Amino acid sequence: MNIASGMNQMLAQLKATSDLAAGGNKPAAVAPAASQADFGQLLKSAVDQVNTVQQTANQLSQEFVRGNQDVELHDVMISLQKANVSFQSMIQVRNRLVTAYQEIMNMQV
């Protein structure tokens, strides 16, 4: 599972919960239980993938600094940018989760 599909599933679950809490009387259509993953597992998987990308970029940059002839500068720069993009994406997901939580907490019962 890649990061984007995991994040899309998390956002779909958040939207369904938000719609239900906002007064909808029917839950949104949900994927079959066999393919549906736990929200916590999806979030942990996405964080682990971001962490792996960052560690790989860090290892590549350290190898380049040590003078390893097999590691080229453009490979290091690409891996660092991939790590940056994945981290920024994770920050945006976190921001949306916090916003959704705040909206749910501010709803009147």
Swiss-Prot record:
Predominant subcellular localization, coarse grouping: other
Entry superkingdom: Bacteria
InterPro entries, per database record: FliE (IPR001624)
One Pfam family cited in the UniProt record for this chain: FliE
Recorded GO CC terms: bacterial-type flagellum basal body
GO molecular function terms attached to this record: cytoskeletal motor activity; structural molecule activity
Cystine residue pairs: none
Keyword Signal applies: no
One annotated GO biological process: bacterial-type flagellum-dependent cell motility
Signal sequence segment: none
Subcellular location, record wording: Bacterial flagellum basal body
Keywords annotated in UniProt: Bacterial flagellum
Keyword Glycosyltransferase part of the UniProt annotation: no
Family under the similarity heading: Belongs to the FliE family.
UniProt name for this protein: Flagellar hook-basal body complex protein FliE
Source organism per UniProt: Nitrosomonas eutropha (strain DSM 101675 / C91 / Nm57)
